Design a protein with these regions (language model features):
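Conserved functional micro-motifs across diverse proteins
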Residues: 1-57, 61-159
């Protein structure tokens, strides 16, 4: 899918990504067959195993020092390696780290999960792209956003 943005930027190689007033600091990258919260309890959201695929997951801490919450349903995440695109999603842990949620409130610090689906045998993405709009509002045009950030993640150690 051809995506466009009015303003494009590239995060520096390394562990941090800045998106509006939210700072993402990566701790690790890993390949997983399923993605669960750190302390699952009762009913919880998770990504179950998909035959023929592995999840490439970048996790760490996100800190929202802004005045707006982020609903990840309003942004688009994908991974890339050369001409290959990987479908992606951004989720957060709730405060108890017992569930995966799609919202980060203002003045919050939460664990984040950039989750990208990779075919078995395929190299994982070396870049994560995030497309979003002012105030994190929903895009009016399916393939156009106000901002895009390219975040090189190939320097993260794959566990």
């Amino acid at each position: 899918m051809k995506l466009t943005a009015d303003h494009e930027s590239k995060a520096g190689a390394g562990m941090k990504l800045q998106m509006n007033a939210i700072t993402f600091t990566a701790d690790k990258a890993e390949k997983l067959k399923e993605v669960k919260p750190a302390n699952p309890n009762g009913y919880y959201n998770y990504y179950e195993e998909q035959e023929g695929y592995t999840y490439f997951v970048v996790t760490g801490k996100a800190e929202n020092e802004g005045s707006m919450a982020l609903d990840t349903d309003n942004i688009l995440v994908r991974g890339t390696r050369g001409n290959i695109e990987y479908k992606g999603k951004l989720l957060f842990s709730n405060t108890e780290e017992s569930d995966l949620v799609n919202k980060m409130e203002k003045d919050a610090e939460q664990t984040f999960y950039f989750i990208l689906l990779v075919k078995d045998g395929q190299e994982p993405p070396d870049t994560i792209e995030v497309f979003y709009n002012d105030d994190f509002r929903k895009s009016q045009k399916a393939e156009h956003y106000d901002y895009s950030i390219r975040w090189p993640v190939d320097s993260l150690d794959l566990e």
